[in-house]
């Protein structure tokens, strides 16, 4: 029996030695450009065939256990239009296991993303990817795999959205046709706790095709099943600088979103801010041509079509001001009210 134990001990010892040698060799192998290029080619060939469209990864650089770097990533949609193009994508891994993955930071540089709704169906051009990864088994309990992320950084990225069912607006910010150039974004302090998702928007600046220039945007963001809340908000636009302790909206039932202007309740606490009416005109085209600089503070609350204002302090030029509490009329038909500067 002792002899058998010794033989087994030696056998397992040799086995683990070879396993260790294999792991070391694999660690060196996976670092070679030849092996990583092979992985990239296999991955792109696989998804090109699965999705029946063009997929390409120019370069893969993997540092075992803590870093994945991709270069020249390209995905076309089923109409052969460019869906995603990324010059470089870096994933810094903090830790992982069988049921969890924690990413310390995701860094995307010089990317281009174009998302659009088809005419006349309204189907999104990325739907084929969503369908591919959707589970066909709706009866089984999903695995409890958790993905955590500490920080996202976007550098010099372009984001475009189009709904081709709706014609483009001639002036103003068109939410159905958005094209953001030179997007720079930093998001950190992610929390994902059940229905609550929260994060810190540390920096966001970009310029839209309409001419609206977001020179800076910072806020603490919280999203749950009853609404959205931004605290410690700072916004700098073309000629406006806005400070707000809170910008939030809430609803009791998701069905309220179908009648957004009448059933979703806002609460906006604006601290002393400087707003140019030309910037407001991006959101309210009827005010196009106005360029007065307004000093403003106060709390705006209630539904969009029946806003109320408390502690309003509005100042224009040197001697014109308005202070008080206001109950605004229904602006559901803005064109019915003549705006003049």
Q: Where does each model-flagged region fall?
A:
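N-terminal type II signal-anchor transmembrane helix
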Residues: 1-50
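A short, amphipathic edge element
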Residues: 51-58
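Structural motif
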Residues: 64-65, 224, 303
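Repeated loop/turn-to-beta-strand initiation elements of outer-membrane beta-barrel proteins
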Residues: 227-230, 305-309
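Transmembrane beta-strands of outer-membrane beta-barrel proteins
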Residues: 231-233, 269, 310-313, 325
